[in-house]
Amino acid sequence: MAMAIALRRLSATVDKPVKSLYNGGSLYYMSSLPNEAVYDKEKSGVAWPKQLNAPLEVVDPEIADIIEHEKARQWKGLELIPSENFTSVSVMQAVGSVMTNKYSEGYPGARYYGGNEYIDMAETLCQKRALEAFRLDPAKWGVNVQPLSGSPANFQVYTALLKPHERIMALDLPHGGHLSHGYQTDTKKISAVSIFFETMPYRLDESTGYIDYDQLEKSATLFRPKLIVAGASAYARLYDYDRIRKVCNKQKAILLADMAHISGLVAAGVIPSPFDYADVVTTTTHKSLRGPRGAMIFYRKGVKEVNKQGKEVFYDYEDKINQAVFPGLQGGPHNHTITGLAVALKQATTPEYRAYQEQVLSNSSKFAQALGEKGYELVSGGTDNHLVLVNMKNKGIDGSRVEKVLEAVHIAANKNTVPGDVSAMVPGGIRMGTPALTSRGFLEEDFVKVADFFDAAVKIAVKVKAETQGTKLKDFVATLESSAPIKSEIAKLRHDVEEYAKQFPTIGFEKETMKYKN
């Protein structure tokens, strides 16, 4: 907490940007590119190198302009989507480097292409740092850093360790789960996972908003799953990994912990780790972990147990998972992403990173408190992690309509199902989180102000709904966009939001280089 305050004060006192990082709006490494005269002199008959080394704003001003608009959106708005974050300049430099040029099917030391000396070094270093970031013994844990994203990583685990149509249990999507855990309705298999495997959900106790572990255990006894997923995308409480481990032991099931949302908190040691209980752990790398867009699969290795004959039995996950990633479901890995991930994992072991994650939790707790004081109903009554899930039903409005108003005033949040919902398209909740704004330096009292902005937006949404003639979402949007008094309220709130957001540092680019600062 104290470190977070100090860092924020430090950022506020910086008058001038660090010029060494940028050169006229482009990243510094662009300044080392060959100039036009070199190519005119050495290769007068070859035209394309000149184009290849030209900066983006010259080659494609349309895309450059879109990027500038996105910079302005990130600077002027409030980013509350809990699965999003602002990655660092150093990570973006690695992701935008020459590491993107290389093909490297296979694994370090066993590639199907030549010229991978430095690619192997980067991937091996990334693996080493991944284990270090989560304080894992390399004799007991291994990691694959090649998965392209979280959903593919989960599917790679299923195909590695399960036979077709074997059984998976996971948290139901309307109760906070994720599509990649095998979601299906009574009439349709929504996720491809549910096509290739048999899936059964466990759910929340709707009276408390917590996972119903007693019912989970009863369902597992009847369903006899081969794998149980402990992970969520909209669950504001901590998982009882010990309880699920005991269920897995009874069913001789694999425990897969999907920590995509919370891996940054786990790395910092500010919430309990799933590694003490899980057989396999997956995570994305771009949420609370604050790296590039990718994923990792951690798996147990070494001695699993000693059998009745006194012989050691070893985990057999490593080869199965590696083969499922490549060549099973992927070709060449994205080496620029792996390189950027290595940088992010190094950052995850620093004191600044722990201070940041502590602040994420403090901000989330304060945000939940402020919302509760304004009469908002939180699923489970609060939060233990980086997110809050607000049930809007007691306000007479749904998440879809509130999301539209939030978007209009430059607050990015997302509609989300809550227990009891019957429609995923018009759900009753709004999901919000603190990682992104905490990266910009927001502290507890700033999230009290964010709660004020949210409350003002909800009141506008309720007013728009009352003035709307039709019952469909498009009718609501039409009123939102056509009513002069409503448009005036929206404009005022948007101005207030922007003026507040603009007080805080930009992340990944410098304000002085922006095209759209007003």
Swiss-Prot record:
PTM annotation (N6-(pyridoxal phosphate)lysine): residues: K287
Subcellular location: Mitochondrion
EC identifiers of the protein: 2.1.2.1
GO cellular component, one term: mitochondrion
SS bonds (residue pairs): none
Source domain of life: Eukaryota
UniProt GO BP: circadian rhythm; glycine biosynthetic process from serine; photorespiration; response to cold; response to light stimulus; tetrahydrofolate interconversion; tetrahydrofolate metabolic process
Enzyme class: transferase
InterPro entries in the record: PyrdxlP-dep_Trfase, PyrdxlP-dep_Trfase_major, PyrdxlP-dep_Trfase_small, Ser_HO-MeTrfase, Ser_HO-MeTrfase-like, Ser_HO-MeTrfase_PLP_BS, SHMT-like_dom
Names of required cofactors: pyridoxal 5'-phosphate
Sample GO molecular function, one term: mRNA binding
Presequence extent in this chain: 1-31
Pathway annotation from the record: One-carbon metabolism; tetrahydrofolate interconversion
Keywords, comma-separated and alphabetical: Mitochondrion, One-carbon metabolism, Pyridoxal phosphate, Transferase, Transit peptide
Record's signal peptide: none
Summary of the function given for this chain in its UniProt record: Catalyzes the interconversion of serine and glycine.
Xref: PANTHER family: SERINE HYDROXYMETHYLTRANSFERASE, SERINE HYDROXYMETHYLTRANSFERASE 1, MITOCHONDRIAL
Subunit structure: Homotetramer.
NCBIfam families the record matches: PRK00011.1 (NF000586)
Family: Belongs to the SHMT family.
Protein name: Serine hydroxymethyltransferase, mitochondrial
Organism annotation: Solanum tuberosum (Potato)
